[in-house]
Amino acid sequence: AEVVEPSGRCTAKTTSNEIYAVTMMMADKRNNVWYCRAEKGDIRETIFSSMINTIQLMGLERMFVWSLSPFQITCLQTGAKCYFSGINGKTDDDMTATKGFTPNGNTLALCILDESDQVKHFNHITAWESTAYRFLLPHGKMVYAYNPPMNRHHWAYTFFGDKVKNGASRIYATWRDIYKLLPIKTIQQIEKFAKNDPEYYRYWYLGEPVNFKGMVYPQFNREKQTRDIFEFFAERDRIVELHIGLDEG
């Protein structure tokens, strides 16, 4: 099963995925997890540290051990492992970054691609999927978590949109869904942006594309800045040519 998770910031989608991963690992030795990002160099400071924090948040640090070389977390109760990888190839058509991956026991219960939109090219996701599906258990899940890009023409909108059209589950969340769990200062900051900078708020916290590419400038006022062309015509005049000038930036 595929799960697409496009959401804004402060929605706990990363923590929720990690709690599910920990729960799966503790249930069965076959429930290995493959936790990935675009760049291998980002793993330690992001998903590896985050996963450890979630284990500690759940009070289960005594049930797990972890190592830095390779980046790996093992459940002492079952032996299930969480592997960490960067999936970007060296070029757009380089499909080899995850080619040699093999999990313990040749099984995977959960594959998570965090910040999926940061992958350089969707070819790299396709290559990652081809490896993952070789080991994915019947109950296994492929999870694509990301904050929607500002640019509505980014490849992620089509790529993940097609997945949903083809049957993938879509989970969309905002900060309001975990309102009671957020620190009061975080809520105050969010509400400040909602009031003072609604465009930024929509992008950052609601996960909506708001950049100006393909959009009318927010300063545009139809009443002030459009005129009926026929106001400029003399009687019995007609349009012979229409020239349209566009500026983008």
What kind of feature is each model-predicted range?
Residues E2-Q72, A156-T158, A173:
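Conserved P-loop
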Residues E2-V4, N32-W34, K81-C82, L110, ...:
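Residue-level preference for the first positions of well-ordered beta-strands
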Residues R37, L113, Y146:
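Short beta-strand/turn micro-motifs composed of small residues
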Residues G41, D114-K120:
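Catalytic acidic motif of RecA-like/P-loop NTPases
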Residues D42-A109, P209:
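Inter-Walker segment of RecA-like/P-loop motor cores
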Residues L108-D114, L246:
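Hydrophobic residues in beta-strands of the RecA-like P-loop NTPase core, especially within AAA+ ATPase
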Residues Q118-K195:
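ASCE P-loop NTPase helicase motor core
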Residues Y179-L246:
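ATPase catalytic-site recognition across NTP-hydrolyzing enzymes
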